[in-house]
Amino acid sequence: MSAQVATRRLTQADLAKLYQAGEKIAQFTCYDASFARLLDGAGVDSILIGDSLGNVIQGHDTTLPVTVADIAYHTAAVKRGCDRAFIVADMPFGSYQESPEQAFRNAATLMAAGAQMVKLEGGADMAPTVRFMVSRGIPVCGHIGLTPQSVHVLGGYKVQGKGEAAAQRLKDDAMALKAAGATMLLLEAIPATLAAEVTAMTGVITIGIGAGKDCSGQVMVLHDAFDIPPGKKAKFVKNFMEGASSIHDAACRAIAAVKDGSYPGPEHTYSA
């Protein structure tokens, strides 16, 4: 697929067709026009303007300082750089938790900047907010498992959903978000078997990061996948620059690995 790049921007319907056909969806985080153009040329299906920009672009220890204005700025830059990839924008900490009205207002800002969908963290507690947003024309991706905006509540960056009770809570969260109208779920740092169950039971697109190979697709943090800067990374990260002739080649290899199911491998996966 990397050799065939369409000129029309992908839509939710296009991603649904990939999902229904059993084709894995390849998503990268990206924050600027140059990398967006490179990823688009490699055939990426979706770009996430993640609040991870707080870590990899702004140099913060957490994602918490990122603002709506930050995400909107980078979303607009990404949109200008690519013609094909489906664009998802993160809702940063403090931009949606107060009320559904606050969430809609800030999501509308991100949609105006070029997002086709927004992503927010939280489970059943956020279902009323998701329902409010979807009913007013905002497509929503839920984010459950390890939710970095709740790092202080979680006590650090730890694998979630371990143990029967924790796994059931995560399943309940997934079903609540689906019922509220979320058409995509990002599953982060949970056991692969649990991610497979959630994917099967919800019937919506699931995008994994540290959640095993049975999700509908994978999201890769650009800087991690390209080893920028070199150093220790999370277990689920693969350095696609190893053996690559260029960053474009690394991007093509990463997308192909998601599509053919070779990434993530067992070495990138958490067990229950």
From Swiss-Prot:
Enzyme class, UniProt record, top EC level: transferase
Pfam families: Pantoate_transf (PF02548)
Pathway: Cofactor biosynthesis; (R)-pantothenate biosynthesis; (R)-pantoate from 3-methyl-2-oxobutanoate: step 1/2
Cofactor note: Binds 1 Mg(2+) ion per subunit.
EC number: 2.1.2.11
GO molecular function, one term: magnesium ion binding
Keywords recorded for this protein, A-Z: Cytoplasm, Magnesium, Metal-binding, Pantothenate biosynthesis, Transferase
First-listed, main subcellular location of the protein, grouped into a coarse class: cytoplasm
Residues that coordinate or bind Mg(2+): D51, D90, E121
Active-site residue list: E188 (proton acceptor)
Any one GO BP annotation for this protein: pantothenate biosynthetic process
Swiss-Prot/TrEMBL cofactor(s): Mg(2+)
Catalytically driven reaction(s): 3-methyl-2-oxobutanoate + (6R)-5,10-methylene-5,6,7,8-tetrahydrofolate + H2O = 2-dehydropantoate + (6S)-5,6,7,8-tetrahydrofolate
InterPro entries: Pantoate_hydroxy_MeTrfase, Pyrv/PenolPyrv_kinase-like_dom, Pyrv_kinase-like_dom_sf
Localization (cell): Cytoplasm
Reported function: Catalyzes the reversible reaction in which hydroxymethyl group from 5,10-methylenetetrahydrofolate is transferred onto alpha-ketoisovalerate to form ketopantoate.
Subunit architecture: Homodecamer; pentamer of dimers.
Record family assignment: Belongs to the PanB family.
Name of protein: 3-methyl-2-oxobutanoate hydroxymethyltransferase
Gene source species: Dechloromonas aromatica (strain RCB)
Encoding gene (name): panB
